[in-house]
Amino acid sequence: RFQYSNSVRDLLGLKVSVFSLPEQVAREYGNYYQPETGKMPDVVKVGNRALGKSQLIEPRLEGITPYPQDLRAEHGYDNQADQLSLSPILLEQFLELSQSIVNSSNFNAKTVGVWNDVFANPETDDVENAIKERLRPLLQQAFRTKISEATLRRYSDYASSFLRDGTDFTTAMKATVGGILASPRFFYL
């Protein structure tokens, strides 16, 4: 859950949490972590939800489907090979989760850092090329490797199919990004 949530937040530049993580005991407030500055602040404000029920709950996306339950291996480890399979049912649950993320009522320009780079209407008439230009860096970051032209074409054709059916650009890109977030290549498999 932590890895998926952090990966989605990093990929989309989310300014809110994907979903609540009650097992996350310590919570920081004040956005102290800024590695580009090379400095740590003199004071860090940290809350502990487990010990103080009145601690702030961070803002998060609304209406998110619960994270699919993994099979737990012996002794609490979740990295044993026989437990790391991805069944069709689990993949379907991840697809539902990813679609609920991009269709959240507060998934918009205020909460999504890459909104203008990915979801906003392009300022060009060559929409097909704009889709490819937007998806290439997103796919490379999501899949952590250089992507092939065939992969780029597959995802850009998917987005274009929505546009041909009369769907607006933002909705088409949301559906495509939802597919990226549900791809086994995004799950570190």
Task: Label the predicted regions.
Residues 1-189:
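Low-complexity, glycine/serine/threonine/alanine-rich intrinsically disordered linker
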